[in-house]
Amino acid sequence: MADKGLEDVPEGQIESNYDETVDSFDEMNLKSELLRGIYAYGFERPSAIQQRAIMPVIKGHDVIAQAQSGTGKTATFSISVLQKIDTNVKQCQALILAPTRELAQQIQKVVVAIGDFMNIECHACIGGTSVRDDMKALQDGPQVVVGTPGRVHDMIQRRFLKTDGMKMFVLDEADEMLSRGFTEQIYDIFQLLPQSTQVVLLSATMPQDVLEVTTKFMRDPVRILVKKDELTLEGIKQFYIAVEKEEWKLDTLSDLYETVTITQAVIFCNTRRKVDWLTDKLTARDFTVSAMHGDMDQAQRDLIMKEFRSGSSRVLIATDLLARGIDVQQVSLVINYDLPANRENYIHRIGRGGRFGRKGVAINFVTADDVRMMREIEQFYSTQIEEMPMNVADLI
C-alpha cells in the first residue's frame, strides 16, 4: 500500500513522506575527519537536498530523492557513503552507479576530495579504460566503487568486484540510466547484492521504469522531493538573442565574442555534427575552442576536460550528453547555440553556470522556430528569459 502514492503523483513527481531538515553540517553527527573534508571542499551549509536526505541515508533507510543536477546531490550521497563505511575494512562497501563515464569520474573526484582526511580508496570502474587496470584496482579492495552499469556488471560477473561486503547501493540519475538501456544490467546487479543492502536512488524525473525499480528493490523508502524552485536557476541571468535565420547564428556568436571577455564558456549544440561544424568554423576565424561529444574516445574526452578545467582552453563546445558531466566552477557563461530539444535539459546545461550561488549568465540563440520552445522552458521553470541588453559585457 505504501507505494500507492507513487503511482498517482502528477507529472512524474514523487510525493515526499519525510520533511525533517538539518541545516548545518555540524549538527549531523559526522565523523570529524569527514566534517573537515566537507569544509575544506568549500561547502559552508547544506543545500536543500543535503538538509533533508543525508540524515535518513546515514540512519540506514532506503531513500528515493528526486532532484536535478546543481542541487548538491552528488555530495549528498558522497557524504552519506563516507560516513557509513568502515575505513579499516579493505573491501567494497558502497557501490555507486552513474549513466556516463564523465559523471562517474566526477563523483569519484567528489568522494576522494571530501574523504581527503579519511583513509579511503575510491575506484572508478568505467568503460573505455583498461579491464586489467580495473581488476588490479578492485583486488586492492577499495571501500567505494563508482562506475557505469556495463563495466560494473562485468566486474561483478568476473568476480573481481566482490559484493558480499556491500552495505550501500546508490543509483545516480536513475532515469538516465534506464533510458539508456541499462535496465537489464541494473536488475542483474540488484540480484547479486546481499539482501540487506541499503538502496539510495536519485533521479530528476520519475518515469514508470524508475518507479518499478523502487517497488521491486527498495524497502519502505523515505521519499524526498526537492522542487524545481529550489534549483540553481537562481543567480543566473538568462537572456535570448533573436536570430532571424539559423545561418546567422555563427556571425551572432562571433559578434558576441568581440563584445565580451570570456573567462570560461560552454556552448551547447544539439548534434555531434553541429559541434564539429561549429568548432571548425570558429577555429577558421581564429577563435580558440575545444569540442567534446560522444563519438570521441575516453582518452580524448579526458584530455579536453583537463585542459578546460585548468583554464588552458577557455571555450568548450559540447552536446547534451555532456551537460550532466561538466562541472567546472569557473564557467561564467553558457551559450545555447541550439535550444535544447527537451526542456528538462535546459537546467542541466545552464544550472552549471551559477552553481551554489555563483553568478552566471546564459544566452540563448532563438530563431522563429524556437520561440515556442523558449516559452515552454520559461513556463516549466517559472522563469523569465529576457532579451539580451547592450551592456551584457558588464554582467559577465
UniProtKB/Swiss-Prot annotation:
Location of this chain's protein in the cell: Cytoplasm
Chief subcellular location: cytoplasm
Residues where ATP binds: A67, Q68, S69, G70, T71, G72, K73, T74
Keyword check for Nucleotide-binding: yes
Top EC group: hydrolase
Domain Helicase C-terminal per the UniProt entry, residue ranges: 235-396
Annotated catalysed reactions: ATP + H2O = ADP + phosphate + H(+)
Domain named Helicase ATP-binding: residues: 54-224
UniProt motif Q motif: location: 23-51
GO molecular function terms attached to this record: ATP binding; ATP hydrolysis activity; RNA binding; RNA helicase activity; translation initiation factor activity
Record keywords, A-Z: ATP-binding, Cytoplasm, Helicase, Hydrolase, Initiation factor, Nucleotide-binding, Protein biosynthesis, RNA-binding
Enzyme Commission number(s) of this protein: 3.6.4.13
Record flagged with keyword Protein biosynthesis: yes
Any Gene Ontology CC annotation: cytoplasm
A GO BP annotation: cytoplasmic translational initiation
Coiled-coil regions, chain positions: none
PROSITE patterns associated with the record: DEAD_ATP_HELICASE, HELICASE_ATP_BIND_1, HELICASE_CTER, Q_MOTIF
Motif (DEAD box): 172-175
The protein's role, per its UniProt record: ATP-dependent RNA helicase which is a subunit of the eIF4F complex involved in cap recognition and is required for mRNA binding to ribosome. In the current model of translation initiation, eIF4A unwinds RNA secondary structures in the 5'-UTR of mRNAs which is necessary to allow efficient binding of the small ribosomal subunit, and subsequent scanning for the initiator codon.
Notes concerning its domains: The Q motif is unique to and characteristic of the DEAD box family of RNA helicases and controls ATP binding and hydrolysis.
Description of how the protein assembles with itself and partners: Component of the eIF4F complex, which composition varies with external and internal environmental conditions. It is composed of at least eIF4A, eIF4E and eIF4G.
Record-stated family: Belongs to the DEAD box helicase family. eIF4A subfamily.
This protein's name: ATP-dependent RNA helicase eIF4A
Gene: TIF1
